[in-house]
Amino acid sequence: MSPQTETKASVGFKAGVKDYKLTYYTPEYETKDTDILAAFRVTPQLGVPPEEAGAAVAAESSTGTWTTVWTDGLTSLDRYKGRCYHIEPVPGDPDQYICYVAYPLDLFEEGSVTNMFTSIVGNVFGFKALRALRLEDLRIPPAYSKTFQGPPHGIQVERDKLNKYGRPLLGCTIKPKLGLSAKNYGRACYECLRGGLDFTKDDENVNSQPFMRWRDRFVFCAEAIYKAQAETGEIKGHYLNATAGTCEEMIKRAVFARELGVPIVMHDYLTGGFTANTTLSHYCRDNGLLLHIHRAMHAVIDRQKNHGMHFRVLAKALRMSGGDHIHSGTVVGKLEGEREITLGFVDLLRDDFIEKDRSRGIFFTQDWVSMPGVIPVASGGIHVWHMPALTEIFGDDSVLQFGGGTLGHPWGNAPGAAANRVALEACVQARNEGRDLAREGNEIIKAACKWSAELAAACEIWKEIKFDGFKAMDTI
């Protein structure tokens, strides 16, 4: 038995497996401006050196396979292979390493998130030599990002379409999420929009079920929008979920929404898929529709710290695939979202240029060049007492979405919407006057209660509601 066979057998490999590190571990490599760079959190099997594990990730996510093949001689492996160019230990965990991999641009089809992910987060995640693998971040070079359309419209165009400036936008997910008839659903939309919200929203799992077919819902929601607009003088919208079982059906629903003259549609981009999402995004730009994105299924992919893919990667992928809004967590509500990490990927969604900042989980400097930004949506377990914190954390270019925090108001839907609008206007005015929302938030809300009975009632019913005491899973 050769020494190579003995070594491989001792760590669970079979004879004939080649040493990946001989070809794919290249610490001397200087990355190119056109490379796609990836940071993987790697947990090797016992006995597998980190250099071999990192090289295996680079190989299996690019050109490599488990043995030498004769067709390697028919191409330039050095031109096309991924390279593990740097490895660093994870502080506090001696069994984990951050392995940096560079991929040449020619490995990927232009304008295809689907193809990019098929390589980078494909079969390699089931590789036996690894106990766990997580993609922490990607650097998308301008040479690749410029092959994508990106968001259909972007932040500034949306504000111009809505004629709303200088404050966050307000939304509400209609509840109960399933079971309402189309007419009652439309009634709830109208009441919320008339009460002061900018948007109402289909829940992510509202598609076209027996209790409410999509066409009926679209018609009643459009009626609600036009009635609320006529009464308030403000432009209103409802996120009509176009997600469907086929791309053809999805586009048919988007076409009907456009024919109704509504401003925005919605897609569940992970369950619907990146190919479908990019298709819908292109349609929305060509036809003047805004596109709201829900991230249903993201926690299956991103919640475990050791395995899967961080949401900042999914956020970058969405910006390339296309969407004008995306749910991003709240920091203060019922859903997972640590402040600095959340603000890190919020910047990756909105800003043109984001510096590397490991304290916020950003492994690479990212330059989006001229790609439009995406508005983050804070949604999940929030109410009027959270308004100062949300305004301070997310700033103006955001959507603050209160579902139960609107529809759970003791006086009804319209008063619930009015309470949220008054709270937001009070916080924006206080901020513009130079007051500290983080420190004075409760006092600002209490003062506004004196001239809004709707807000006072909301503050009373939700004064004890908190979602504290749970340990965050997503930490640096």
From Swiss-Prot:
- What happens to this protein after translation, modification-wise? The disulfide bond which can form in the large chain dimeric partners within the hexadecamer appears to be associated with oxidative stress and protein turnover.
The organism's superkingdom is given as Eukaryota
Cofactor(s) recorded in Swiss-Prot or TrEMBL: Mg(2+)
Which residues does the annotation say bind substrate? 123, 173, 177, 295, 327, 379
Please list the residues that carry the modification N-acetylproline. Answer: 3
**Cofactor, free-text remark:** Binds 1 Mg(2+) ion per subunit.
GO MF terms here are: magnesium ion binding; monooxygenase activity; ribulose-bisphosphate carboxylase activity
Keywords on record:
Acetylation, Calvin cycle, Carbon dioxide fixation, Chloroplast, Disulfide bond, Lyase, Magnesium, Metal-binding, Methylation, Monooxygenase, Oxidoreductase, Photorespiration, Photosynthesis, Plastid
| Residues carrying N6-carboxylysine | 201
Residue ranges listed under propeptide: 1-2
* Catalysed reactions, semicolon-separated: 2 (2R)-3-phosphoglycerate + 2 H(+) = D-ribulose 1,5-bisphosphate + CO2 + H2O; D-ribulose 1,5-bisphosphate + O2 = 2-phosphoglycolate + (2R)-3-phosphoglycerate + 2 H(+)
Entry's localization field: Plastid, Chloroplast
List cellular component terms (GO): chloroplast
E.C. no: 4.1.1.39
Principal cellular location given in the protein's record: plastid
One GO term (biological process):
reductive pentose-phosphate cycle
Positions bearing N6,N6,N6-trimethyllysine: 14
Q: Which residues bind Mg(2+)?
A: 201, 203-204
Q: Which residues form the active site?
A: 175 (proton acceptor), 294 (proton acceptor)
* Subunit record text: Heterohexadecamer of 8 large chains and 8 small chains; disulfide-linked. The disulfide link is formed within the large subunit homodimers.
Q: Which family does it belong to?
A: Belongs to the RuBisCO large chain family. Type I subfamily.
Other observations noted = The basic functional RuBisCO is composed of a large chain homodimer in a 'head-to-tail' conformation. In form I RuBisCO this homodimer is arranged in a barrel-like tetramer with the small subunits forming a tetrameric 'cap' on each end of the 'barrel'.
What's its job?
A: RuBisCO catalyzes two reactions: the carboxylation of D-ribulose 1,5-bisphosphate, the primary event in carbon dioxide fixation, as well as the oxidative fragmentation of the pentose substrate in the photorespiration process. Both reactions occur simultaneously and in competition at the same active site.
The name of this protein is: Ribulose bisphosphate carboxylase large chain
What is the protein's species of origin? Zea mays (Maize)
